[in-house]
């Protein structure tokens, strides 16, 4: 009876350790499937450019910091209690763009995991100004915009 209790306890501890370490292991697997890391450019945006970017990303209120660890990301995915923050959106856009040409794997689930991992990596290693500059450049290259600035706003 005691042997069965000990085995059950060991198995329970093992399951708890595996569940607790899963987000970190998934992060490592995802980041390992991407060649290299993106390098940021850092010129600050002009106020009109920042307003346009916030409009494009539908950011309201004060910018929130992006998620910077796999456990917080896992909790956000599991509970979905809040929409992605301004910082999360920016890091995801950069990660998606970078992984499109640097991912070692092509299956959808692997691309999604490497995108989540790269998004966390970018949030940890880039400043908000660097993310804003890169996302602004990427969205400016896109052919469609929902927020159109007036012609004089870009000269400020």
Model region roles, listed by residue range:
Residues 2-156:
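Juxtamembrane regions of bacterial inner-membrane/periplasmic proteins
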């Amino acid at each position: 009876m005691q042997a069965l209790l000990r085995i059950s306890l060991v198995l329970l501890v093992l399951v708890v350790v595996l569940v607790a370490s899963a987000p970190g292991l998934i992060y490592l697997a995802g980041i390992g499937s991407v060649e290299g890391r993106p390098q940021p450019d850092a010129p600050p945006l002009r106020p009109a450019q920042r307003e346009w970017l916030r409009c494009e990303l539908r950011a309201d209120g004060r910018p929130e910091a992006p998620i910077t660890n796999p456990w917080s990301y896992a909790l956000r995915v599991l509970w979905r209690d809040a929409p992605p923050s301004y910082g999360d959106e920016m890091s995801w856009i950069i990660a998606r763009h970078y992984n499109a040409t640097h991912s070692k794997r092509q299956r959808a689930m692997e691309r999604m995991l490497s995108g989540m991992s790269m998004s966390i990596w970018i949030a940890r290693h880039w400043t908000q100004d660097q993310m804003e500059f890169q996302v602004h450049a990427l969205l400016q290259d896109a052919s469609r915009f929902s927020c159109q600035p007036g012609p004089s706003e870009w000269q400020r």
